[in-house]
């Protein structure tokens, strides 16, 4: 997972998102339509990205009447890897420093902060 996730580009991640959201294998035509609507991508761009992800073993290809594609990595697995990678690369392995940066940023509302406080209180209780 670690080496694979490092190789998934931002554009390839968009393909993965389409498949994660679908929660079912999709033909290339459905993937193309979704990415054309979201990103304005040409069909050849989507086809290239899907092929790359298959080569990286991030997607499986299944022959029916046409090829269907499904992710071999769950969104949760990828998010866990990406979060861990972020913590190690930017915060020298300190999750505390990541949380501190979020708390001091303007990205969290007061409601978000209260929800986090409540979350940590529940986690601390036996």
State where each predicted segment sits.
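Glycine-centered, phosphate/nucleic-acid-interacting loop/turn motifs that mediate DNA/RNA or nucleotide
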Residues: 57
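Short acidic, hydrophobic short linear motifs in intrinsically disordered regions
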Residues: 25-34
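Amphipathic alpha-helical dimerization/coiled-coil segments
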Residues: 83-124
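Short helix-coil junctions and helix-kink-helix linkers
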Residues: 33-41
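Short alpha-helical segments that sit at the start of domains
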Residues: 1-18, 22, 126
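Short, hydrophobic-biased segments on the C-terminal half of alpha helices
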Residues: 47-51
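Short, cationic-aromatic polyanion-contact patches
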Residues: 7-11, 64-82
């Amino acid at each position: 997972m670690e080496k694979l996730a490092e190789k998934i580009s931002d554009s390839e991640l968009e393909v993965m998102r389409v498949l994660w959201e679908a929660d079912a294998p999709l033909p290339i035509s459905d993937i193309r339509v979704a990415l054309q609507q979201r990103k304005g991508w040409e069909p050849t761009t989507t086809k290239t990205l899907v092929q790359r992800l298959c080569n990286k073993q991030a997607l499986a290809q299944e022959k029916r009447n046409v090829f269907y594609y499904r992710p071999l990595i769950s969104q949760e697995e990828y998010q866990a890897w990406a979060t861990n990678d972020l913590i190690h690369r930017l915060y020298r392995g300190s999750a505390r420093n990541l949380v501190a940066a979020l708390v001091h940023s303007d990205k969290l509302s007061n409601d978000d902060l209260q929800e986090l406080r409540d979350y940590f209180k529940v986690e601390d209780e036996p």
